[in-house]
Amino acid sequence: MRSGQHHIIVISSCILLMTALVNCRQVYNPPAIAAVNSYLVVDGFINTGPNAVTSFNINRTRNLGDSTTIGVPELNAKVSILDTHGTTYTLTDTAGTGIYTSAPLTLDVTGQYSIAITTADGRKYSSDAAPCQQTPPIDSVFWRQPDNFTVYVSTHDPTNNTHYYRYDYSETWEHDANIISPWGVVNGNLVATDTTNQKWRCWSTAPSTNILIASSAPLAQDVIDSFPVATVPQGDSKIDLQYSILVRQYALTQDAYNYWLLIQKTSQNVGTLFDLQPTQLVGNIHCLTNPSEPVIGFISANSVQQQRIFVYETYLTNWIHNSPAFGCDTIQIAYNPNSFPAFNPVDTGYGPYYFNGPTVLVLAPNFCLDCTRFGGTTVKPSFWPY
């Protein structure tokens, strides 16, 4: 690292909860928070796996006083990966979302890599050169369920060279509407549902949000054993049918690990004024245009190992289910079979459930018939087993 060029970023995390403290008479906004600042945030890593794609999410921070905490995408920037031989690999933001992506690359794992960013207003940023870290394979991803459902990961490095690890994951779960009907409505007509128009089975996907890091440095062997990565509380609807989790593992340098550790402590351990005090967060990205400007992010160069598991609800012990039809009271309407397939209910908040004889149609609330009202999509993921 270039010790003279580190930028010190003060994160006053405890201020976030000051208004909730009973004994606080007024809110104190320190100058660093009250000032109009917009710091560059670079989230991502250089993927050194074979034929791998590298992506960086680049945006700018907002102040605590802003109405939203969502970052502002940094658009129309020029972003490149550089190696120590001067070769440049360009990343582009084709969707206009601030996510810059490379073409598939196979980088020399013996080299070192950095990124260069030039924003639309001409400001230039660069990271320190990062050595390549080869991530060892995941030994196993498994789960235990004495009550809550928890997913664990185990790994080891037989060369005893890694010691520092980071994890993230993506959860996908299958969920049904509260009421499953063989009928749907398309363009005002009753139709028998099939895989092209059904609204009763959905799949939702969510990324991890916690910072998950582990270290074997204190141990005699480079082993991570049964590290918990995700927990689903007892009775959560994520495992009403089938659940899947894709766990990803990244090797880190000690500097990168220390960076993520500070972020973890700052973001997860605060709660009162007596918890973690403002933290000095040192990244490895620098503003060349204005060396005093803080930049948030740490660039690593490493490969990725991943493993997916599937869990059926029937695998679990005494898993609690909420009543699926709670609040789904039905009504009946007279239906003239000669008008089939037209469907024009007086109350548009209801949809077709089933026919109770040739002239009676039972209706249910639309929110009970449509799984997408609870999130997700009716398009089955390509990796789903059936």
Where are these regions (language model features)?
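Bacterial N-terminal signal peptides that target proteins for export
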Residues: 2-11
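C-terminal motif of bacterial Sec signal peptides marking the signal peptidase cleavage site
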Residues: 19-23
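A sequence/structural signal for flexible, mid-protein segments enriched
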Residues: 25-386
